[in-house]
Amino acid sequence: MNRCRDEGGRWATPDEQAVLARWSGWGAIPQVFDPTDDRYLDERAELRQLLRSEAGWSQARRTTLNAHYTSAPVVQAMWHAAQQLGVDGDGVRVLEPGCGSGNFIGFAPAGTVLTGVELDETTAEIAQHLYGARATIEATAFEELRVEDGAFDVVIGNVPFAKVTPHDPRHNRGRHALHNYFLIKSLHLTRPGGLVVALTSRYTLDARNPAARREMASMADLVGAIRLPERAFARSSGTDVVVDMVILRRRPPGAEPSGPAWQQVGAAPIDAADDAAPLEVNEYYLAHPEHVLGDLAATRGMYRDHELTVTPTGDLDQQ
């Protein structure tokens, strides 16, 4: 990209685009940004030089917490689900918040009107080089995106996860965590009858506190959810977390809530140590265990010793 800038701001060539398309985000290499990790001194120095500014370096370092992008089979499955629910592509207004390099934009049906939002300027520039001919890429924080509520027919993507509370007086009055905020704002930006199709941390559905789910349920019905196994994103983004694909449909004004129950949690049907606290899972999965792509189990997780996971039982691409 530096070469493109230095040569008059030209677009990337097809060969350069092929290289850029392999980008999986800063989240896959957090150790390069860790000044205490001496194994990557050379790589750290080279990357600082390539980013060309302290601001660019700081911005990239901040996104290592949540810049995890999505493999092609999962993206294609999500678009397939949207199309099965009536998204035909012709003039459909689509938003991808936290778009990264544009994985979902790249697989969008022909004829869709696409907008991507990406905080990291380097990654947004990659998306622009890859998909600028067919999409509008906004290099800004999702909190700063100013569009009318109901502006989109479909919001699709992989929402970021981090223990931060975005400041947005309009769309985060409940002071929800980042992943839930993305979903709540996405629902606001979706027209009545439109869809939000998103990958999110399992904590959206499994958190004991139902406040975020209640706020979502005040606007939308759950169409369905699929829980992916651990390591579903290890190959493409370097992260090893359990995530859900959730599909929400924005209710028209005055419509009664419908669809499956999903606001409460219950005891997960797994064996645990006698002294361990019970692990909880969303009531949707207790009623629909076939929507868990693997076996529920207890493991040592990213944030605690005793955490719910899903061990794979087959080839995710085939499931």
Model-found features: residue ranges?
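Conserved Class I SAM-dependent methyltransferase catalytic core
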Residues: 119-121, 174-234, 241, 245-247
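Class I S-adenosyl-L-methionine
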Residues: 1-130
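Surface-exposed cleft-lining segments at the edges of enzyme active sites
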Residues: 65, 169-173
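Flexible, glycine-/basic-rich loop-and-beta segments that form/coincide
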Residues: 235-319
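General small-molecule cofactor/ligand-binding pocket signal
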Residues: 115, 136-138, 226
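Short, surface-exposed basic-aromatic patches at helix termini and helix-loop junctions that form
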Residues: 108-111, 128-132, 155, 188, ...
